[in-house]
């Protein structure tokens, strides 16, 4: 399971170093567009499981086709290099409006990559409602 918040920097080639805690879990990865203008980083097998699930839904529904196109067309499969770096393609960097300072967060079965300022704003906004939404999202679990 991916956990935690890790500030990192993009180098001049749009690369960042994977946090040490994630390295053993991410040998082959897929990077794609995420929700709220962040990027999702999946282990390749998890990405295949999710994309299979999406592809097995009713392609007769326009919203399913639209989502599938956006989700898969931006995806980039790769292997981290020997220094554990991941390259962010230009179209993905533009989508998430990533600057030099980025934040890598563990989100359970995947990793999210945020522009650090955007992450701080999102976190500040969402933390205020965190306890209030618990009853709706996870009733009786905690």
UniProtKB/Swiss-Prot annotation:
<dbReference type="InterPro" id="IPR035642">
    <property type="entry name" value="MraZ_N"/>
</dbReference>
<protein>
    <recommendedName>
        <fullName>Transcriptional regulator MraZ</fullName>
    </recommendedName>
</protein>
<keyword id="KW-0804">Transcription</keyword>
<dbReference type="GO" id="GO:0000976">
    <property type="term" value="F:transcription cis-regulatory region binding"/>
</dbReference>
<dbReference type="InterPro" id="IPR035644">
    <property type="entry name" value="MraZ_C"/>
</dbReference>
<dbReference type="GO" id="GO:2000143">
    <property type="term" value="P:negative regulation of DNA-templated transcription initiation"/>
</dbReference>
<keyword id="KW-0963">Cytoplasm</keyword>
<comment type="similarity">
    <text>Belongs to the MraZ family.</text>
</comment>
<keyword id="KW-0238">DNA-binding</keyword>
<dbReference type="GO" id="GO:0009295">
    <property type="term" value="C:nucleoid"/>
</dbReference>
<dbReference type="InterPro" id="IPR003444">
    <property type="entry name" value="MraZ"/>
</dbReference>
<dbReference type="InterPro" id="IPR037914">
    <property type="entry name" value="SpoVT-AbrB_sf"/>
</dbReference>
<keyword id="KW-0805">Transcription regulation</keyword>
<dbReference type="InterPro" id="IPR020603">
    <property type="entry name" value="MraZ_dom"/>
</dbReference>
<dbReference type="InterPro" id="IPR038619">
    <property type="entry name" value="MraZ_sf"/>
</dbReference>
<comment type="subunit">
    <text>Forms oligomers.</text>
</comment>
<feature type="domain" description="SpoVT-AbrB 1">
    <location>
        <begin position="5"/>
        <end position="46"/>
    </location>
</feature>
<dbReference type="InterPro" id="IPR007159">
    <property type="entry name" value="SpoVT-AbrB_dom"/>
</dbReference>
<dbReference type="GO" id="GO:0003700">
    <property type="term" value="F:DNA-binding transcription factor activity"/>
</dbReference>
<keyword id="KW-0677">Repeat</keyword>
<dbReference type="GO" id="GO:0005737">
    <property type="term" value="C:cytoplasm"/>
</dbReference>
<feature type="domain" description="SpoVT-AbrB 2">
    <location>
        <begin position="75"/>
        <end position="118"/>
    </location>
</feature>
<dbReference type="Pfam" id="PF02381">
    <property type="entry name" value="MraZ"/>
</dbReference>
């Amino acid at each position: 399971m991916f956990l935690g918040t890790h500030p990192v920097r993009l180098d001049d080639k749009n690369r960042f170093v994977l946090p040490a805690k994630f390295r053993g879990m991410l040998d082959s990865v897929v990077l794609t567009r995420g929700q709220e203008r962040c990027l999702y980083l999946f282990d390749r097998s998890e990405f295949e499981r999710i994309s299979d699930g999406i592809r097995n839904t009713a392609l007769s529904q326009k919203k399913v086709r639209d989502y599938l196109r956006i989700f898969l067309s931006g995806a980039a499969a790769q292997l981290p290099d020997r220094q554990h770096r991941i390259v962010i393609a230009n179209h993905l960097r533009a989508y998430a409006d990533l600057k030099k300072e980025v934040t890598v967060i563990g989100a359970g079965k995947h990793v999210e990559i945020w522009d650090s300022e955007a992450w701080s704003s999102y976190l500040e906004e969402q933390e205020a409602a965190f306890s209030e939404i618990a009853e709706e999202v996870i009733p009786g679990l905690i």
